[in-house]
Regions:
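Alpha-helix capping at helix-to-loop junctions
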Residues: 102-105, 137, 167-174
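A structural signal for short, well-ordered beta-strand segments and their strand-loop junctions
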Residues: 126, 131-134, 173-178
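A short beta-strand motif that forms part of the nucleic acid-binding face
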Residues: 136-138, 180-181
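Metal-dependent nuclease catalytic regions and adjoining charged, substrate-binding loops involved
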Residues: 27, 152-156, 164-183
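Metal-dependent nuclease catalytic cores that hydrolyze phosphodiester bonds in DNA/RNA
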Residues: 1-131, 138-156
Length: 183
């Protein structure tokens, strides 16, 4: 299958309940359940990680922000509703990947650990061989992915993040799979 039909394939599968032959339905469902349990477990028991380390997920952040983190300055504590928003994003990512599999697309390299010159990260996956970063976004953020303006207005560093994963994998075949979290 090709990634250019991915969204339509998911919608078709949801609408018709027809899952392509060969898709291990029960395995996908069981894996989804286990992954959701782990996400919740991590979010309610996870201890703080060392923010002084540069990671793929923060290489696109502003230099000043990275400097403060690296030098141990504490920023504002995240509010509980913000933590829940991040949890929601992780759950959406897992759901989207399960739907991708159920629609018959090949999802590999999930959470593969990569490294470029000592900077480590966990790429989301490859879908049909394409390095893919899965995101949930507000309608405003979603529009940036859809119209391509993210390349010039990227407050979260997503472009640099995916470039880092691409460099580690030796590929230029990359993309985002983004869900508008309000629709």
């Amino acid at each position: 299958m090709a990634t250019d039909t991915l969204v339509d394939d998911i919608y078709r599968m949801i609408d018709t309940k027809e899952i392509p032959d060969g898709v291990p339905i029960e395995q996908v469902i069981n894996d989804f359940g286990e992954n959701v349990k782990q996400i919740l477990r991590n979010n309610i028991t996870e201890s703080k990680f060392d923010k002084r380390k540069l990671r793929m997920s923060n290489i696109g952040k502003k230099d000043r922000q990275l400097w403060y983190s690296y030098n141990g300055y504490k920023g504002e504590e995240l509010m509980p509703h913000t933590r829940i928003k991040f949890l929601y994003g992780h759950l959406i990512e897992e759901m989207v990947l399960a739907l991708t599999k159920l629609a018959g697309h090949d999802v590999t390299h999930e959470q593969k650990q990569v490294e470029v010159q000592g900077i480590k990260g966990s790429m989301d996956c490859k879908i049909d061989g394409v390095l893919t970063d899965v995101k949930s976004a507000s309608p405003y953020g979603f529009k940036k992915f859809k119209d391509g303006s993210l390349i010039n207005d990227d407050p979260f560093g997503y472009v640099d993040q995916i470039k880092g994963y691409a460099h580690a994998e030796g590929t230029t075949d990359v993309g985002w799979l983004v869900m508008d979290k309000t629709n």
